[in-house]
């Protein structure tokens, strides 16, 4: 009798897992999975950003952009990132069809080199 009660629950979990893994493999326009109305994207660590109050993958945002002003992290050169104040490095996507890059900060190596050079001059 207990197995009859558990069977519908097991079927529900199986169907939910099937849908979840099917959606995870498609990257086109599917959002990363959460809304960013009140809080930022939780999935930012795996490459998601907020656009129109929904979290999308970064390469999807860049591929669908008509201009650089569609998202604050889109760029075509390092100067664009510095001008917008969103970083100092414009990284292009591996896909050649995407004409915009993504801004991020890349300062740690520069600071280490600058500190090393300063140390070697004073000694």
Swiss-Prot record:
Propeptide positions: 59-123
User: Which residue spans traverse the membrane?
Assistant: none
Disulfide bridge positions per record: 32-48, 36-50, 41-55
UniProtKB keywords: Antibiotic, Antimicrobial, Cytolysis, Disulfide bond, Hemolysis, Knottin, Plant defense, Signal
UniProt signal peptide: 1-28
Post-translational events: Contains 3 disulfide bonds. This is a cyclic peptide.
PROSITE patterns referenced in this protein's UniProt entry, alphabetically: CYCLOTIDE, CYCLOTIDE_BRACELET
Alphabetized InterPro entries for the sequence: Albumin_I_a, Cyclotide, Cyclotide_bracelet_CS, Cyclotide_sf
Q: Which GO terms describe its biological process?
A: defense response to bacterium; killing of cells of another organism
The entry's note on the tissues where this protein occurs is:
Expressed in flower, stem, shoot, root, leaf, seed, pod and nodule (at protein level).
Could you tell me at which residue positions the Cyclopeptide (Gly-Asn) crosslink is annotated in this chain?
29-58
What is one Pfam family matched by this protein? Albumin_I_a
Stated role = Probably participates in a plant defense mechanism. Active against Gram-negative bacteria E.coli ATCC 700926 (MIC=1.0 uM), K.pneumoniae ATTC 13883 (MIC=5.5 uM) and P.aeruginosa ATCC 39018 (MIC=7.5 uM). Has hemolytic and cytotoxic activity.
Q: What free text does the record give on domains?
A: The presence of a 'disulfide through disulfide knot' structurally defines this protein as a knottin.
Q: Which family does it belong to?
A: Belongs to the cyclotide family. Bracelet subfamily.
Put simply, this protein is called Cliotide T4
């Amino acid at each position: 009798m207990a197995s009859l009660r558990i069977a519908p629950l097991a079927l529900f979990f199986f169907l939910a897992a099937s849908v979840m893994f099917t959606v995870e493999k498609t990257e086109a326009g599917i959002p990363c999975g959460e809304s960013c109305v009140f809080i930022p994207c939780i999935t930012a660590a795996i490459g998601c950003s907020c656009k129109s109050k929904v979290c999308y993958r970064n390469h999807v945002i860049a591929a669908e952009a008509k201009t650089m002003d569609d998202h604050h992290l889109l760029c075509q050169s390092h100067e664009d990132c510095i001008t917008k104040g969103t970083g100092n490095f414009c990284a292009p996507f591996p896909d050649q069809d995407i004409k915009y890059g993504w801004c991020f900060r890349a300062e740690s190596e520069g600071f280490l080199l600058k500190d090393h050079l300063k140390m070697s001059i004073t000694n």
